[in-house]
């Protein structure tokens, strides 16, 4: 009953693999990977199979693997975070604990069922990457080592999601904490793989020994702790709901404690009201701020704050004080944090009313749809903005303490504007998804998908176009010069220089092909107006490397103020359109009954 006849595993596999979305996910995943490989395929009619000409294939394989690694890392929590928390939401958690199944069998069944989708995706993508091996520059052993590292990482991330799912009552909270833990690890792994691209032996050793060993230890520890938690569950009330008492929780809290009557905690988590609500106040906004947030406890909120600050302190020191010209990367971290936490506090504002069957009652009251809309919006926006602002305080601090930024105060102010617009966008998009969809989980996942597409796709397209569309046509025949000491025929030392072959050979093409590639690059630049990351890295920093204009291969983005202005206009228009649609849907009673 542990594996071969595990009813939990069998039920999850039968239900999940027979859904239409499983086939659609596989089709879309392979179509996207195949399109990337096809677009990045070397355009040369003759390929140099020696070591000097192997750079194109190596870069293509690295791009394929890093992209697949990040995609799998983002999908693993979405499959695993609802395994046990979903049982609590469906009110079957108590029945599962009362079954004769051992806790370890339950955890193993949930873990394997959550990872079966990713296992199929990873296995089916192997033939695509094998197409790149005949190009040279990468061996079969490197590909297999990369897939071993990918498999070990995905299993670890899935186990983290299952562990979070056993701790929290709601899938939304488990998913948020899972992403907050997994995303830094995934970015660290992707950057390490990219930095070691010229150290094949070292990368092969790490991928086959240290990484799988570390992942095995992590999985074993989390598996044991999750099984023990199911063996000795916390206090369970009616219908399998865990009882959360705020006073008891605060007494047992280790580390950060949230007190709603003190500053700054009352900005994002005010205490419950013990007096009458003043006249003219928005009852929806007051209810959302003082009841909804603390109704599920403060554990998720405390973890989010502590993990974000733990990561922000070293990043602040490195990007603001050690390398001041790298400040855009810290701002990107702040925006990425808001991308993770912003939708959480807005994606369930309306779907939770539907799930509790209270939306009809709310719409039959004297509260107008406009009051409901703005109350829901400002409640989620207030919490996410205050949490994000905790990471913004290093910006004015660095502007005052570091002389390097005294001539860049306008750019620093624009950084804050970009962060504020990103906070608004994440809240509005999540609220729109909450109005359109019926279930909170679907609303949250759709909001994440839309926001990541808007924010991440334009920079990814720009990088791809610069390196694989325009780059081959503008690569120089000689990229660096090596010096060597030789002896002439008379025995005298002579310093000679010899050209080093480029990493990627230049492609000889006519001017029409080059012009077409440059036009594609210009279109990719225009897409940057939808992404705060493109706007951040387009802002100039005087006296830094950002002022250096790149050649035709990269078509310098730094100092392009029009990208920042375009982003501000695009964001305001997008949010205005979405809010207008939400207001119209409230007036027509969209999906109120049923």
Model-derived features: where do they sit?
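Transmembrane alpha-helical segments and their membrane-interface loop/helix boundaries
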Residues: 1-73, 82, 121, 127-352, ...
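Helix-loop-helix units of permease transmembrane domains in multi-pass membrane transporters
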Residues: 9, 83-115, 285, 293, ...
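N-terminal cofactor/phosphate-binding cores enriched in small/glycine residues
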Residues: 26, 42, 50, 66-80, ...
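Mid-sequence acidic-hydrophobic segments that form the walls
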Residues: 78, 87, 98, 109, ...
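Hydrophobic or amphipathic alpha-helical targeting/insertion segments
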Residues: 99-107, 118-126, 167
């Amino acid at each position: 009953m542990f594996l071969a006849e595990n009813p939990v595993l069998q039920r999850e596999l039968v239900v999940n693999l027979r859904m239409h979305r499983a086939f659609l996910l596989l089709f879309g995943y392979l179509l996207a990977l195949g399109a990337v490989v096809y677009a990045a395929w070397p355009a040369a009619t003759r390929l140099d199979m020696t070591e000097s000409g192997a750079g194109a294939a190596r870069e293509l394989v690295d791009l394929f693997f890093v992209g697949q690694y990040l995609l799998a890392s983002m999908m693993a929590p979405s499959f695993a975070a609802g395994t046990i928390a979903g049982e609590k939401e469906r009110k079957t958690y108590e029945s599962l604990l009362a079954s004769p199944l051992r806790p370890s069998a339950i955890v193993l069944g949930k873990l394997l069922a959550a990872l079966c989708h990713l296992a199929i995706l990873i296995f089916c993508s192997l033939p695509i990457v094998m197409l790149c091996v005949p190009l040279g520059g990468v061996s079969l052993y490197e590909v297999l080592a990369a897939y071993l590292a990918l498999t070990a990482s995905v299993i670890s991330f899935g186990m983290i999601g299952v562990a979070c799912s056993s701790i929290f009552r709601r899938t939304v909270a488990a998913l948020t904490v899972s992403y907050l833990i997994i995303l830094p690890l995934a970015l660290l792994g992707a950057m390490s793989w990219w930095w070691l691209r010229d150290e094949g032996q070292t990368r092969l050793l790490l991928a086959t020994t240290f990484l799988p060993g570390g992942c095995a230890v992590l999985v074993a520890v989390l598996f044991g702790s999750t099984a023990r938690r199911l063996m000795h569950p916390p206090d369970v009330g009616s219908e399998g709901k865990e009882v959360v008492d705020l006073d008891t929780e605060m007494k047992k809290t280790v580390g950060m404690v949230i007190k709603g009557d003190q500053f700054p905690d009352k900005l994002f988590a005010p205490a419950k009201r013990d007096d009458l609500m003043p006249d003219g106040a928005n009852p929806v906004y007051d209810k959302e701020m003082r009841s909804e947030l603390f109704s599920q406890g403060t554990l998720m909120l405390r973890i989010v704050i502590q993990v974000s600050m733990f990561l922000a302190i070293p990043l602040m020191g490195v990007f603001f004080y050690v390398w001041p010209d790298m400040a855009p990367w810290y701002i990107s971290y702040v925006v990425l944090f808001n991308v993770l936490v912003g939708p959480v506090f807005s994606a369930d504002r309306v779907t939770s009313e539907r799930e509790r069957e209270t939306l009809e009652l709310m719409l039959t009251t004297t509260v107008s749809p406009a009051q409901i809309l703005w109350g829901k919006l400002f409640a989620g926006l207030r919490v996410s903005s205050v949490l994000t602002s905790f990471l913004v305080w290093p910006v004015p601090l660095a502007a005052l303490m570091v002389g390097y930024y005294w001539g860049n105060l306008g750019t620093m102010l624009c950084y804050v504007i970009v962060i504020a617009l990103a906070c608004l966008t994440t809240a509005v998009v999540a609220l729109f998804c909450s109005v359109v969809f019926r279930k909170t989980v679907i609303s949250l996942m759709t909001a994440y998908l839309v926001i990541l597409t808007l924010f991440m796709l334009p920079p990814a397209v720009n990088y791809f176009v610069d390196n694989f569309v325009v780059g081959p046509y503008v690569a120089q025949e000689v990229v660096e010069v090596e010096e060597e000491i030789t002896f002439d025929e008379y025995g005298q030392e002579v310093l000679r220089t010899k050209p080093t072959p480029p990493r990627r050979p230049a492609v000889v093409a006519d001017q029409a092909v080059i012009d077409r590639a440059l036009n594609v690059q210009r279109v990719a630049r225009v897409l940057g107006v939808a992404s705060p990351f493109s706007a951040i890295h387009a802002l100039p920093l005087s006296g830094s490397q950002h002022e250096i204009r790149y050649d035709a291969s990269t078509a310098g983005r730094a100092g392009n103020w029009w990208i920042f202005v375009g982003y501000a206009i695009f964001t305001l228009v997008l949010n205005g359109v979405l809010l207008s649609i939400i207001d119209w849907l409230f007036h027509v009673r969209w999906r109120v009954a049923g």
